[in-house]
Design a protein with these regions (language model features):
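Conserved PLP-anchoring active-site segment centered on the Schiff-base-forming lysine
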Residues: 98-139
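Active-site C-terminal subdomain of aminotransferase-like
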Residues: 239-337, 352
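PLP-dependent enzyme catalytic core of the Aspartate aminotransferase-like
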Residues: 7, 382, 391-433
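Conserved N-terminal alpha-helix of the aminotransferase class I/II PLP-enzyme fold
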Residues: 35-90, 94, 106-117, 146
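Conserved PLP-binding catalytic core of the aspartate aminotransferase-like
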Residues: 347-380
């Protein structure tokens, strides 16, 4: 029977977790802090749960240098349900509400009579409101489709569709910004949305894009490198890649988007405008007001995330605090890409070199030869290298290089990549090297 030590898992998510965290989790699930009650059993409103939540928030602020001011320069940290897909919707609900609130304020201050505000709002909405989406992979495409479903495609501006800039009409590049069709007027742009790392297509932004009211999905590269939070209106991440277990989503929201700095429009006004009103469990102001405890938060999942962050904090030695993990992520990715690039054509990396993801390395074996890829996967599994099959929508091989994948695992996989390539060059095809 395989042991945890004999298996190296490269699955795209849920992803591996640090063994030390899981070992501690196996104890607290039965008896938390010698209370005689398991952590999954304690009330989410108990002092113990509040301490776990506070520790998680504190750790995240330290790791990403998140401003804590109550003023316009500060950011709120939320723990939510619904995963990244839930936030596809939540970002639309909230950013459209913020846009409406700002338009209402502008109309009122310009002297429009109260009984005429909604009528004027409707005119402005129909003519001006745009949601900008940078479509660089499968997940940003899904997010843009959800926005179109909620508010209508006429309000969704596809700033760039990367498929149109590559042979084969497939994702794998991020065109230069001077080719983008962004909404120039900030008063018209409710949000600019991008996915920082596309797990299916192996594409990662190398720097923060420009745009008004910037919203980022960082689900698959969260806490793998330093980021400039201050450039963003909102950032969200599903926990199950780099930070914890499936069940929670973390959102970092600018105070400028929340009460009291922005008062949300009455739902009656949103209905009159024909705009969607989101479920209360996705409502950022409600979650923020209730310290992420409006409904039952899975405290065990928050505890896991806090322990992962504690490990990152204790292992860091530079500034920013995430720099140690960033260096390790880069080291593993460089090692793996080097083996792939020096395979004399046995492997072909799917995305363009300029946008290669450090987290999700998407590869074809012998140009996508089904037998060769099957042999590669079979040989990998026989060595305890698991979870390497590509996403069902694109096939191939995908190496997910998340934070908890140790350097030793990347080294073992690198050796196998080199061995398999040599065997293929000799004419072998059985993956039994």
């Amino acid at each position: 029977m395989p042991t945890r030590e004999s298996i190296h898992y490269f699955g795209a998510g849920p992803a591996p977790l640090p063994t030390a965290v899981l070992e501690e989790a196996s104890k607290v699930i039965l008896n938390y802090n010698d209370s005689g009650v398991g952590i999954a059993e304690i009330s989410h409103r108990s002092p113990e749960a509040n301490a776990i939540l506070a520790n998680a928030k504190s750790g995240l602020r330290q790791l990403l240098d998140i401003p804590e001011s109550e003023g316009p320069d500060g950011y709120e940290i939320l723990f939510l349900h619904g995963g990244g897909s839930g936030e596809f919707s939540a970002t639309v609900y909230h950013m459209v509400s913020v846009w409406v609130a700002r338009q209402m304020k502008q109309l009122t201050e310009s002297g429009v009579e109260e009984d005429k505000v909604v009528e004027k709002l409707r005119e402005v909405l129909e003519k001006k409101m745009k949601l900008d989406y940078l479509v660089t992979g499968s997940w940003s495409l899904k997010a843009s489709q959800e926005a179109a479903r909620l508010v209508g495609s006429e309000h969704v501006n596809i700033v760039v569709d990367a498929r149109k800039h590559r042979n084969g009409n497939k994702f794998g590049v991020i065109p230069a910004e001077d080719s983008w069709s962004q909404t120039q007027d900030e008063t018209e742009c409710a949000l600019t949305y991008y996915c920082d790392n596309e797990t299916v297509d192996g594409v990662e932004f190398q720097s923060t894009p420009s745009g008004h009211n910037l919203v980022a999905d960082m689900s698959s590269n969260f806490l793998s490198r330093s980021i400039n939070v201050r450039k963003h209106a909102a950032i969200f991440s599903g926990a199950q890649k780099n930070i914890g277990t499936t069940g929670i989503t973390i959102a970092i929201i600018s105070n400028k988007l929340l009460p009291p700095l922005t008062e949300m429009p009455d739902p009656k006004i949103m209905r009159k405008l024909g705009l969607p009103i989101g479920p209360i469990v996705l409502d950022w102001p409600t979650i923020a007001k209730n310290n992420s405890l409006y409904n039952t938060l899975p405290i065990f999942d928050v505890w896991i995330a806090s322990k992962v962050m504690d490990r990152l904090l204790h292992s860091s030695s530079g500034s920013p605090r995430i720099s140690t993990q960033e260096a390790e992520s880069n080291k593993k990715a460089t090692m793996l890409y080097s083996a792939l690039d020096n395979s004399s054509g046995v492997y072909s990396v799917v995305p363009d070199k300029s946008v290669r993801s450090r987290m999700n390395i998407c590869v074809r074996v012998k140009g996508g030869d089904a037998d060769a890829e099957k042999a590669f996967l079979k040989g990998a599994e026989s060595r305890g290298l698991m979870g390497l099959k590509g996403h069902r929508s694109v096939g191939g091989v995908r190496i997910s290089n998340y934070n908890a994948v140790p350097v030793e695992a990347a080294e073992k996989l690198t050796r196998y990549l080199e061995e398999f390539a040599k065997e293929q060059q000799k004419g072998g095809a059985n993956g039994s090297v």
